């Protein structure tokens, strides 16, 4: 989706590295422009390659391996590199455990699965009672081979692609979906009503938290729910925050905003 590439482009600029992101036309333009702004280069994989060489996600991964080898570079491989979830295990997991040692639930989205897997593993090792809830876009195929298209670009994984090794399914207690319409209208609600510019991954957790609490009224068993708010909305200005784009895709829904207003007072 481009979130990791943005971060790596920024780090590379600060440390003087040459950086190339392997992308396709489906990545949001705002993210691609951010990578360019940090001096990063973009290598585009095409839909034609998708038809010839397997799923486009797998084409991107193979292209990254090939270019790294040809140019004496390093392919960080966010999908299978165990250092990815380990980074969250040693940082975010510890931070949350220190701040909320008695949390009942951890809610986060899964793309490569690294942030939720690493964080969730640390918390479970230190809190036997915590439950981990994994969210993916409706249409994603992490837990079902029968996916379909969706517009959310942060979390999720398309049907037919080789699944990442970084997802630790053993620590996931509950799995659920959030639809495009729910996520994008939540993004717009928090920007317009709360002054918070959140991305689609963050919006998924915020919407699901409302749904979860409503379906499970606060009781002695549910006291503290920790949400991973993992992305900013600045990378989504050209679609989720664009009225014309939302209308074109038939995603605007005032009822969702009303529902959120009643919950997030």
Per-range role (PLM):
Residues 1, 16-29, 221, 225-229:
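Conserved PLP-anchoring active-site segment centered on the Schiff-base-forming lysine
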Residues 1-15, 28-32, 109-120, 201-209, ...:
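Short glycine/serine/threonine-rich phosphate/pyrophosphate-binding segments
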Residues 2, 12, 35, 76, ...:
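Buried hydrophobic positions in well-ordered alpha/beta secondary-structure cores of metabolic enzymes
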Residues 11-26, 121-131, 242-249:
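A glycine- and small-aliphatic-rich helix-loop capping segment at beta-alpha/alpha-beta transitions
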Residues 20-105, 137-185, 191, 264:
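Small/polar-residue-rich loop-to-helix segments that shape phosphate-bearing ligand pockets
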Residues 22, 77-78, 109-110, 134-136, ...:
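Short beta-strand segments
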Residues 165, 210-265:
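Phosphate-binding loop/pocket of nucleotide- and phosphate-handling active sites
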Residues 167-220:
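Active-site-adjacent helical/loop segments in soluble small-molecule enzymes
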């Amino acid at each position: 989706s481009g979130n990791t590439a943005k971060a790596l482009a920024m780090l590379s600029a600060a440390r003087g590295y040459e950086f190339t992101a392997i992308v396709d036309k489906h990545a949001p333009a705002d993210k691609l422009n951010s990578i360019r702004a940090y001096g990063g280069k973009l290598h585009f994989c095409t839909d034609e390659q998708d038809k010839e060489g397997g799923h486009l996600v797998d084409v991107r991964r193979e292209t990254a391996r090939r270019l790294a080898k040809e140019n004496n570079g390093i392919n960080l491989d966010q999908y299978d590199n165990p250092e990815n979830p380990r980074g969250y295990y040693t940082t975010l997991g510890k931070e949350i455990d220190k701040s909320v040692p008695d949390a009942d639930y951890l809610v986060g989205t899964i793309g490569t699965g690294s942030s939720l897997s690493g964080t969730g593993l640390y918390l479970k090792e230190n809190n036997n009672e915590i439950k981990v809830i994994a969210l993916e876009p409706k249409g994603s195929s992490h837990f079902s081979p029968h996916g379909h298209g969706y517009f959310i670009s942060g979390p999720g994984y398309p049907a037919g692609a080789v699944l990442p090794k970084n997802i630790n399914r053993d620590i996931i207690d509950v799995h659920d979906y959030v639809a495009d319409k729910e996520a994008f209208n939540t993004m717009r609600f928090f920007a317009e009503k709360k002054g918070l510019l959140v991305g689609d991954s963050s919006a998924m957790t915020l919407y699901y938290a409302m749904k979860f609490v409503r379906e499970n009224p606060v009781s002695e068993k549910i006291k503290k729910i920790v949400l991973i708010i993992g992305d900013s909305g600045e990378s989504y200005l050209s679609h989720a925050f664009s009225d014309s784009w939302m209308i074109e895709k038939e995603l605007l829904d005032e009822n969702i905003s009303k529902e959120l207003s009643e919950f997030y007072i």
